[in-house]
From Swiss-Prot:
Protein name as catalogued: Lysosome-associated membrane glycoprotein 1
Carbohydrate-modified residues: 34, 59, 72, 80, 103, 117, 126, 146, 161, 179, 215, 220, 241, 253, 260, 285, 299, 314
Gene assigned in the entry: LAMP1
Region (Second lumenal domain): 220-374
Membrane topology according to the record: Single-pass type I membrane protein
S-S pairs: 38-76, 151-187, 223-261, 330-367
Record-linked PANTHER family: LYSOSOME-ASSOCIATED MEMBRANE GLYCOPROTEIN, LYSOSOME-ASSOCIATED MEMBRANE GLYCOPROTEIN 5
Residue spans crossing the bilayer: 375-398
Amino acid sequence: MAAPGGARRRPLLLLLFAGLVHGASAVFVVKNGNGTACIMADFSATFLTSYDTRSGPQNKSFELPAGAEVSNSSSCGKENASDSSLVITFGRGHTLTLIFTRNATRYEVQLMRFAYNLSDTDTFPNSSSTGVKTVESATDIKADINKTYRCVSETQVNMDNVTVTLRDAAIQAYLSSSNFSREETRCEQDLPTPTTPPQPAPTPAPASPAVFRYNVSGSNGTCLLASMGLQLNVTYRRVDNKTVTREFNVNPNKTTFGGNCSATLATLELHSENLLLLALQFVMNESSSRVFLQGVQLNLTLPDAKEGSFTATNSSLRALQATAGNSYKCNAEQRLRVTSSFSLNMFRVWLQAFRVDGDKFGPVEECQLDENSMLIPIAVGGALAGLVLIVLLAYLIGRKRSHAGYQTI
């Protein structure tokens, strides 16, 4: 792997089934003109893209290959300037760029940019477009100065019609030595969830919520169709100043729903006695024809809360993505982190926003969790079949040799 001033790669140890599901991890190093490392990154990455073909939109998932290299366009920044960058190239004209910035106490990946070459017919067969397309997004990757950003859990960065998933990541910029710091700043996904002291009569966790079919209609017909079970996971401070985490199922039998529609915005609103408002806001990106959940708003009455209620809002999500006209489906439980104190747990999701034909769902786009759950048994089955074949061949060869040893006299 080439890098300014040189770069190194660590030996790779691939496990049989892990190698079948996820790509290999690699160490990427950027050095300054004196040969001193200023950026080090060690992670594996998966890219999930949607591109247009003559027969319609097509999803493509691929890994960052072991042969990926650090580009000479990577930079440590000029003198003590805060901006520096790691540019990774792979395949036929694909690049992943991490742009860093810092202040006196912390540094972060301010921007992640992915440029992919639609002329690469091996990666994007039957693409109706050619040339390089570039997407970018801010990230939550940040750490204290002189500490390594560490995240064993998956970290997803959504960029228009591309989702980049990093795994087992160790990243450090503005290095004080040529190695990762032993001190780490862990990502929020790796931190233990808040726990509460044992209570005399703890509230049991609720069972999976009931699945219900919701719909929202406007002047042009149905704009949102959803079948799902919803569960609220909230962390709050009680009147006794103890912090607790509780889960609440949304009971369809005690909930009313409504919403509104526009050309590029569809909102589902749920109300009940304690659930003053749960709003899910879906948007359509007209340039990419991608539909996704962008906003979640919660207003919940909690009698034992110190504030008497709980509120949370996030209007910058990019979840539950699908192509306009298609439906999104996920049988696996999904935990959507809305804020640090609120997660929306979703069960057996099947939904479609925009271009809904009456009360029927369009062509299905499966979620990544469902696709991964199918890959593992296929990989295990293939390995077992290969093992059985080897044993059978060994048996037949041994039997043939034993017969050859008994010749008629």
